[in-house]
Amino acid sequence: MENRMVTPFDVEDDREQYSLRPTTLKEYIGQKKVKANLDIFIKAAKKRSESLDHVLFYGPPGLGKTTLANIIANEMTGNLKVTSGPAIEKAGDLAAILTSLTDYDVLFIDEIHRLNRSIEEILYPAMEDYALDIVIGKGAAAKSIRLDLPKFTLIGATTRVGLLTSPLRDRFGMLCAMEFYTDEELMEIVVRSAAILNVNICREAAFEIGKRSRGTPRIANRLLKRVRDYCDVKHDGDIDLQGAKAALDLLEVDKEGLDKIDNKILEAIIFNFKGGPVGLETLAYFIGEELDTIEDVYEPYLIQKGFIMRTPRGRVASEKAYNHFGVTKKEEKDNQVSIFNK
């Protein structure tokens, strides 16, 4: 998965993307409902000279959760402190972060569903009362001291909202579902990023890149950079539709945004498991991927695009998946030959 061009996760090559991120809500493209709500809540908080209520962003990776956290910090004129659930190993780690904050600061915790439960409980008074409870001493001599915390905003991000405990989830004032972007929104993101990178690109080429970006801005920016490399070498540096298509075909990202691994999953269901249903564990074992990786990384897009369906008995290939390989269910049953052997 590490070398996938269409992985939605942050990789080393994406570091340049930080310079492409918008810094205000006005610059931010997509997520219209989330953006509209945040605009109202931020303006209301600033009007009352209060910190913004705590926010939880949830949805697939690469859709702009971290970018929105940066924007909120900028709009609230506070500093952004970034950490993650797995990085906070001890109660003292979280206490140190909380006591370093000032009014209107934003604490962003990525993968918040992976917080240790004992550490999570420290957040409860911090979120509700802006207070930190510390126990000093041991045994009968132990006593609890409450420290006041500044009026900060906690922003949590998760790809697995169902794994959050109810007490933690209920303490967020705003729960924002991040959705996949439309092809048109991704085209606008590509055009904007190309301008920042000083690359000339036609809108048709930008749309082609956006269309193959799996509804994910992070992937769109990554593909843009690789298409730029191709056109710098094979063309005059400008990106036209022909150059974009040639570069993306060379990268093995097809017109639906699927790569070799996506096609491998569909091939397995159709040609090796007769279209399904097939259990997720069996499918993961067959294609050599982790179960969680399939469920969190590959499956959301394949379901969202209508290639596979979840059923109580397992995963089933849709008619669209059969059409993708140019076969019908009848042809597949008459010829149970795996594409893997071709």
UniProtKB/Swiss-Prot annotation:
Positions annotated to bind Mg(2+): 66
Region ranges (Large ATPase domain (RuvB-L)): 1-181
Catalysed reaction, written as an equation: ATP + H2O = ADP + phosphate + H(+)
Bilayer-crossing regions: none
Region of interest (Small ATPAse domain (RuvB-S)), residue spans: 182-252
Binding site for DNA: 310, 315
Region of interest: Head domain (RuvB-H): 255-342
Gene Ontology CC: cytoplasm; Holliday junction resolvase complex
Keywords per UniProt: ATP-binding, Cytoplasm, DNA damage, DNA recombination, DNA repair, DNA-binding, Hydrolase, Nucleotide-binding
Subcellular location, principal: cytoplasm
Documented EC number(s): 3.6.4.-
Subcellular localization, as worded in the UniProt entry: Cytoplasm
SMART domains according to UniProt: AAA
Domain of life: Bacteria
Biological processes, Gene Ontology terms: DNA recombination; DNA repair
Record CDD domains: AAA
Residues the entry annotates as binding ATP: 20-21, 62, 65-67, 128-130, 171, 181, 218
Molecular function GO labels: ATP binding; ATP hydrolysis activity; four-way junction DNA binding; four-way junction helicase activity
Keyword DNA repair: yes
Annotated HAMAP family: DNA_HJ_migration_RuvB
Function: The RuvA-RuvB-RuvC complex processes Holliday junction (HJ) DNA during genetic recombination and DNA repair, while the RuvA-RuvB complex plays an important role in the rescue of blocked DNA replication forks via replication fork reversal (RFR). RuvA specifically binds to HJ cruciform DNA, conferring on it an open structure. The RuvB hexamer acts as an ATP-dependent pump, pulling dsDNA into and through the RuvAB complex. RuvB forms 2 homohexamers on either side of HJ DNA bound by 1 or 2 RuvA tetramers; 4 subunits per hexamer contact DNA at a time.
Family that this chain belongs to: Belongs to the RuvB family.
UniProt domain comment: Has 3 domains, the large (RuvB-L) and small ATPase (RuvB-S) domains and the C-terminal head (RuvB-H) domain. The head domain binds DNA, while the ATPase domains jointly bind ATP, ADP or are empty depending on the state of the subunit in the translocation cycle. During a single DNA translocation step the structure of each domain remains the same, but their relative positions change.
Protein known as: Holliday junction branch migration complex subunit RuvB
Source organism: Clostridium botulinum (strain Langeland / NCTC 10281 / Type F)
